[in-house]
Amino acid sequence: MNNLPSLDLHGEYSFSSEVLVKEFINDQISLHNKKCCIIHGIGEGIVRKTVHEVLKNDKRIKTYYIDFFNPGCTIVEIKEKI
């Protein structure tokens, strides 16, 4: 995970997280990165739910999952062909 590009959303609100995640994914696609990490923290899960909703609705995302060793982080895999 340390080598993956990451977006840290600590301290962000749900509405700003949505915009930041969309911009981050666009950047990763432009850079031809196929895997990245979104750090949302554990807390009450509000930001995590927003992140997962954005990822679920983005057709360019192959899969996403909570990191096994760090539940405050979601690993995102981007489709090869977009």
Please place each PLM-identified region on the residue numbering.
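Long, charged, low-complexity intrinsically disordered regions
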Residues: 1-82
